């Protein structure tokens, strides 16, 4: 417990909670303060100017980060026939239909992403109570229900992140690892923000991207000054 207290004291000394930092300074701070014994993820929280109580203002989607997430992703695909062969060729670890569903019902969940072709949803639909609570249920809005399962597998392997606002209108996702080059983290963040802007609900009024904070797995959030990001990202 003493180590945690010391770590938090150092973070409080270094990070001004009232300040918005230039993106490069923010990333440097994260790297300096990342003292865990494992390579921490760099996470982002984006406060959106939406009314999350209204379904037509909710933001959900997926985008492939230019430099990936640094995670090794295991993919399960529900499909059959030529699509099954294409999914395997694209790198999917698990491919099947009823047989794969039976594995999952038995508690065998050795995967991070589930993809399904539309004709397989009759099988996947039976797994809603298992996959849903884990955020693994395939959904066309994030590209995981698609006739082109091979492309979806490649996207998942390439570092695709899925995003969905919480009840407070905040998006939480990852943009890489703390050992990534600063430029790569910045470009991943900018790619995410561009995707979020494209997903802006037409009903959302006023400032859309209200606040951007980045943090490491074990660290505190550092607010980012959006004016230091690429012009296409700025509000």
Swiss-Prot record:
Molecular-function GO terms, alphabetical: rRNA binding; structural constituent of ribosome; tRNA binding
PROSITE patterns tied to this protein: RIBOSOMAL_L1
UniProt KW keywords: Repressor, Ribonucleoprotein, Ribosomal protein, RNA-binding, rRNA-binding, Translation regulation, tRNA-binding
The organism's place on the tree of life at top rank: Bacteria
GO biological process: regulation of translation; translation
InterPro entries, A to Z: Ribosom_uL1_bac-type, Ribosomal_uL1, Ribosomal_uL1-like, Ribosomal_uL1/biogenesis, Ribosomal_uL1_3-a/b-sand, Ribosomal_uL1_CS
Record note on quaternary structure: Part of the 50S ribosomal subunit.
Function noted in UniProt: Binds directly to 23S rRNA. The L1 stalk is quite mobile in the ribosome, and is involved in E site tRNA release.
PANTHER family reported for this sequence: 54S RIBOSOMAL PROTEIN L1, MITOCHONDRIAL, LARGE RIBOSOMAL SUBUNIT PROTEIN UL1M
The name this protein goes by in its record: Large ribosomal subunit protein uL1
Organism lineage string: Bacteria, Pseudomonadati, Pseudomonadota, Gammaproteobacteria, Enterobacterales
């Amino acid at each position: 417990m003493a180590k945690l207290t010391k770590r938090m004291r150092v973070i409080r000394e270094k990070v001004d909670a009232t300040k918005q930092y230039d993106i490069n300074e923010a990333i440097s701070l994260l790297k300096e303060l990342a003292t865990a014994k494992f390579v921490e993820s760099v996470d982002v929280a984006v406060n959106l100017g939406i009314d999350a109580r209204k379904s037509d203002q909710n933001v959900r989607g997926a985008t492939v980060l230019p430099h990936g997430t640094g995670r090794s992703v295991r993919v399960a695909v529900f499909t059959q026939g030529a699509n099954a062969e294409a999914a395997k060729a694209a790198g999917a670890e698990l491919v099947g239909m009823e047989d794969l569903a039976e594995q999952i019902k038995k508690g065998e969940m050795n995967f991070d992403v589930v993809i399904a072709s539309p004709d397989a949803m009759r099988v996947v639909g039976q797994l809603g109570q298992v996959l849903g609570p884990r955020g693994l249920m395939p959904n066309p809005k994030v590209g995981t229900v698609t006739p082109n399962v091979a492309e979806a597998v490649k996207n998942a392997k390439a570092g695709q992140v899925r995003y969905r606002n919480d009840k407070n209108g905040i998006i939480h996702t990852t943009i890489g690892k703390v050992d990534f080059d600063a430029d790569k983290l910045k470009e991943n963040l900018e790619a995410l923000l561009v995707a979020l802007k494209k997903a802006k609900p037409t009903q959302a009024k006023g400032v859309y991207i209200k606040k951007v904070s980045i943090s490491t797995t074990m660290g505190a959030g550092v607010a980012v000054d959006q004016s230091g990001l690429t012009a296409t990202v700025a509000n």
